[in-house]
Amino acid sequence: MVQDNGGAIAQKGFNYQNHVISLTAIRNYTKNNFEIFVESDDDFEVLYDDNYHAYIQVKGKKRIGLKSLLQKHEGKCSILEKHLTPGDGHSKYKIVVFHFTESELSKMQENTSEELFEHSLKLSTEQTDYILEQLDESFSTKLTNFSLVKTSFKNDYLEARTYLKGELINQGISVDGRDDLILDELDRLIKQKSEYIIENKDDKKLKRI
């Protein structure tokens, strides 16, 4: 009998997403007016200062590439089109992965002004033109604000936890043997905020970390 592993696979995806949100919080919590909103207009959003707003999509599975990001199913928007829909020309857009098509990665360029993560990649001119052939030209400005983030950890719970513990130390956060407790509490908070259902625009504040 073939086992249905859909639930387990979905849970791994959520674990990876939560680890990415945790990493973002650990690396950036000292920024002025720093806020994270989970499961709102995207997998999560980051705001800081008075004008920074990033929409972040997390893909915790293999075989991710430009083709899959642009693929439409049953007439619905593609992943990339949906990702670029909220916000405006000043917003930042990031898709976070642990695996991406190598031939496409090699064409991308290092983003020298990455704000949230250790590093990220910008699309090449060729890749940008390819995407705009399949998206409305109105997405052109937003696409210039898009970057791809490839994490140093895979979609593996223990590997991600080990990496996050190292990041706590790198950011000068005193753990005193409480690193597991800190990460557990952060994970609990992310899950709690993710479960709130938005019924009107005022409910978005319930998603804030």
Which ranges hold each PLM region?
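Basic, amphipathic N-terminal segments that precede the first structured/catalytic domain
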Residues: 1-3, 11, 15, 26
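A sequence-composition feature that detects small, non-aromatic residues
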Residues: 8-10, 25, 54, 160
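Catalytic centers of nucleases
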Residues: 17-81
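Acidic metal-coordinating catalytic centers involved in nucleic-acid phosphodiester chemistry
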Residues: 1-8, 61-209
